[in-house]
């Protein structure tokens, strides 16, 4: 895969440049564009992934299915499809926004900051997973309600963005409705 960049955003969330992805994530990460996607299988189960230990931010924590950064001149939807293929080796369908205006800032235990405008989507996995071990060290298909209970009981075991996204009542309801259709 070619070197990835993040699209930097100004105070009005408008693109203001790019920066190499690894260089962007520091103790003082600038605001940038990202995405988060929750994948469901045909049985309505949610794919929860555990981030590789080689990840710069939040290594080894459990998180939603796939996250990433749209590249310059790439739509968020195109970026989600690209990252699903790269991280999970999976094709998707029925890509649906569930929390289009999500943004957050969080600092991991090593001091690395995430500072993102991060629209959240749900999608349906349509092929068998072929996980990239450089991105994902473990994964599990689980019932959404079971994952929600785990998020409430042990939020420290999950990425902060996953906890924040699921804690939004409207987003949680949209995810629940998505997995039941």
From Swiss-Prot:
Binding site for Mg(2+): 87
Binding-site residues for Mn(2+), renumbered to this chain: 25, 32, 69, 114, 116
TM region positions: none
Class of enzymatic activity (EC top level): isomerase
Free-text cofactor note: Binds 1 Mg(2+) ion per subunit. The magnesium ion binds only when substrate is bound.
Gene3D superfamilies: Nucleoside Triphosphate Pyrophosphohydrolase
Alphabetized PROSITE patterns for the sequence: NUDIX
Isomerase keyword on record: yes
Any one of the GO BP annotations: isoprenoid biosynthetic process
Keywords: Cytoplasm, Isomerase, Isoprene biosynthesis, Magnesium, Manganese, Metal-binding
PANTHER family according to UniProt: ISOPENTENYL-DIPHOSPHATE DELTA-ISOMERASE
Name listed for the protein in its UniProt record: Isopentenyl-diphosphate Delta-isomerase
Species the sequence originates in: Salmonella newport (strain SL254)
Underlying gene: idi
């Amino acid at each position: 895969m070619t070197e990835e960049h993040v699209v930097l955003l100004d105070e009005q969330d408008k693109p203001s440049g790019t920066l190499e992805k690894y260089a962007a994530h520091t103790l003082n990460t600038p605001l940038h564009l990202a995405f988060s996607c929750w994948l469901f299988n045909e049985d309505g189960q949610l794919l929860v992934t555990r981030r590789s230990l080689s990840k710069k931010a939040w290594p080894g924590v459990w998180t939603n299915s796939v996250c990433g950064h749209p590249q310059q001149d790439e739509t968020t939807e195109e970026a989600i499809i690209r990252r699903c293929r790269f991280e999970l080796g999976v094709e998707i369908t029925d890509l649906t926004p569930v929390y289009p205006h999500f943004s957050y800032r969080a600092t991991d235990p090593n001091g690395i900051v995430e500072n993102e405008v991060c629209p959240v989507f749900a999608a349906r996995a349509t092929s068998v997973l072929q996980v990239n071990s450089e991105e994902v060290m473990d994964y599990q298909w689980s019932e959404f309600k079971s994952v929600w209970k785990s998020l409430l009981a042990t939020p420290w075991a999950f990425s902060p963005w996953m906890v924040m996204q699921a804690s939004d009542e409207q987003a949680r309801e949209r995810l629940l409705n998505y997995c039941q259709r």
